[in-house]
Amino acid sequence: YYVTLESKSGSYATVKVTAMVKPLLADDATITAKDVTYNPKGIKVFVDTSKVPEDAAYTVAKVKNGSKVLSEDSYEYKDGVLTFNKNVAVGTYVVTFESAKYQDVKVSVKVNKAKGTLTTKAKTTVNTAIGSKSFNLGAKATTGMKVSYASSNKKVATVSSNGTVSVKGTGIATITVTASGSNYNTVTKKITIKVAPKKQSVKAKTAKKKLTITWTKDSNATGYQVQIATKKNLKGAKTYTVKSYKTYKKTISKLKSKKKYYVRVRSYKTVGKTKLYGAYSTVKSYKVK
């Protein structure tokens, strides 16, 4: 409707000002829109105008994100759907709807972060050994997310910015892979790297009813396991544990004279309650005197 204001003052001229005053909507006559999730291909916001008068014919006057007014080519409003193009990011947007007959209505729309994805070619647990070649975790994330890496124990394994893991010492390290981005929820994946001692080598000297077995001293190990048997497949072998890496010799007595024995050795590393075993040496045979 229109309001006319008239002013008269003494000998001054009469001034009339006519202005259109848009009525307010009733309290229950509102425009609403639900929050949405970010989509790199574009975002659709469904606007509910069912409670406003049919003759309101609301259109979008402007969209603001904080103090920034979005350019008109970054969105389109048609048939109750407000479509943002792919350049619109996560954030809170205030949409101003205008009508020729009613006062403007402001509606807040929140664009929430989307669920990102993160995959790796590497399994959740990787078993390797000292001397092994570096390998890549093969991580891939949703486009628009940045992948970063961190090692819990750089004395065991390091990881480069492109996800290449290098073995440094025996033990256990956890590689945390993180994918993050301004439009996505952060995703993390943990990969456990278990590094065992390297493969052992073994030699032995025979004597009267005994064998003196020697192997390579391994400072990356906690200790060693020595196996001896009368069968080549080591079925029924007796196992001896040497608990110090500094000891690299074991004499086994009370063996049968003129009997052939098969021996092999491996190193192990103790981490908490876990033992990491290196590969056994090649099986060697010796005939006791």
For the regions a protein language model found, what residue spans apply to each?
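Extracytoplasmic soluble-region selector
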Residues: Y1-Y12, K16, M20-T37, K41-V81, ...
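Predominantly extracellular/luminal cell-surface or secreted proteins
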Residues: A61-V63, A150-S152, Q227-K231, R264-Y268
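Solvent-exposed loop/turn segments flanking beta-strands in beta-repeat/beta-sandwich domains
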Residues: E54-T59, K217-A237
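Recognizes extended acidic, P/S/T-rich segments that occur
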Residues: Q225-K256
